[in-house]
């Protein structure tokens, strides 16, 4: 769980917390120097100084250990009182340097905005790869981060891929500093949104990429929502500046208006489209150009081209004004009409970005190898290191009280498994280490089941390649083999009873019946299903006893198609699938009172349970609610627990069409028991029967999932696209017309969208694209409801005939 605000908490004096051991460290160097030269001055001086050095070194280690222990105690007992400043101040100096040079970032955006292309340049410029390969490139190699054959064939990212690299940042004084970056490239398609979700859950910052032509798109809004959910600071990069119709300032404006986050350009492009040459840095007021066969050399010039001078002055003024709205120091300078220095601007942008108040906007073209390196400098300058981000856990030993995680290597280990993958060597588990050190061969405990497991191997991942390491420190991301767990599990070294909140997992909206073509493939079919469920929390497998079918459920048609194709390729299992099935829901119509008696007394143990109360809508189509308002103890506590269980079971399969129930409240306020014949089973069954009867009397409704649809296509096809949507009874909410394309925003039932992609391709000569995301549930049309009920009743009747 990440703290809602990354702004520093007020620093309070904490008992037992010593000052930073930085001074001890500097004295340590002095003692070491004296010890090394003492033998030149006196035969006995060397051993004497060495003795002092050893004693002082022990004091330093003891001081660091005492400080770490005090910080750990403060993190548990008074997390609000322990500021990030105090945590950083009391870091071991070597650890402070390591963490300050570390960034954990993700790259996220709408589909086809250039995420993977941009990541490929980052890896090349940092020296991680020796050559650039394009997504769907002609060399049949493909981008490094698209390691699956399916990804390279389709030209889309399906799974998030992790890598690491080192970036050497050059200062204005020519001094070079090396930074370590853990980077995760995420998919852009909405069907694979869980990959973005779990990446952002463990990252400290992100680069949000936008298309210079399209600006903020539908999946950009989804990614923004996910970043806000986990309080992830971001910088923005307007890509594809070399494309026809590129308008980066439209993208900046849309970040402000559509995403509702203050944003300002920190660069101005020199030219655009096929005349895009480079950028002007608005903070340093210098021009930046890329040279070399792959743009690997950055050339900095003091001269700003005449053609962009007026735009540069205007955009710098807008940058300062926007910062003045979100940062007190710049606001003071602005009111005093004092021009801020480069250092003041950088510090303000960093504070505002980490505080989730602002996003700086960079510009470039990854495909044209232009202005990617300045964006990397922005990652270092403006995104937080692990010690600057507040992460919270829950202490199960203290009624799940919040505790702060401290990124010290000397603390007890706490880590989160955020992604599972099957490899040739077994299950690969990705872990973010929040506190302590994870060592090869160490025993760790799964907080979910208290199971102890040994860590046989630790690796750093570079897409589908790996590099073995012996240990990983706080703030790092790694992968381990041989650890059986589920996505979202917390691991500790056994000293602490901490658990971390898992990521948000959306409910599936579409299902298919599936079975292997040949019965001999059943074993591999079952293996594949088990593996895919472990890896992807949004992929669900269930068995329908009535139809005797296996059902797979997911986020969309593409999502399920990918898994069916993976089963064929990776497990050599060809499958037969049924038509798509919509995840309908049922809900109560109006308030209904009930007084139900279950009585079976025919010799021997009988059944007796009476439940009295009412059922009504909750007001919102959300979770169901059960309440008891018993006065006088007419139903005992254990029987009321059985009533609640019966209610929950009844909600799993509604009486109308056999789908889950939403937005229904059940209240039991009276009842009766029998001395010998009442049991928990009796009250569970009585509640289910009362539920079914009252539900059917309430004028219930079938609910169908409504989807947010965004269609983008060339302008000449606008009429055809609108016609396609109208045929599906879609509600068109808005349209946007660009230079050569248009975008339609609409709501439509999922049932009406089956086969839409095929019809869209035909209507737009293959040039149209669309995204679809679950929005809400809505009452189905009366005719559809009637058809669904008849179909369900027929299936029930056919089943009883068997």
From Swiss-Prot:
Signal peptide: none annotated. InterPro entries: EFG_II, EFG_III, EFG_III/V, EFG_IV, EFG_V-like, EFTu-like_2, G_TR_CS, P-loop_NTPase. It comes from the Eukaryota. It is found in: Mitochondrion. GTP binds at residues 109-116, 185-189, 239-242. This is Elongation factor G, mitochondrial. Keywords: Elongation factor, GTP-binding, Mitochondrion, Nucleotide-binding, Protein biosynthesis, Transit peptide.
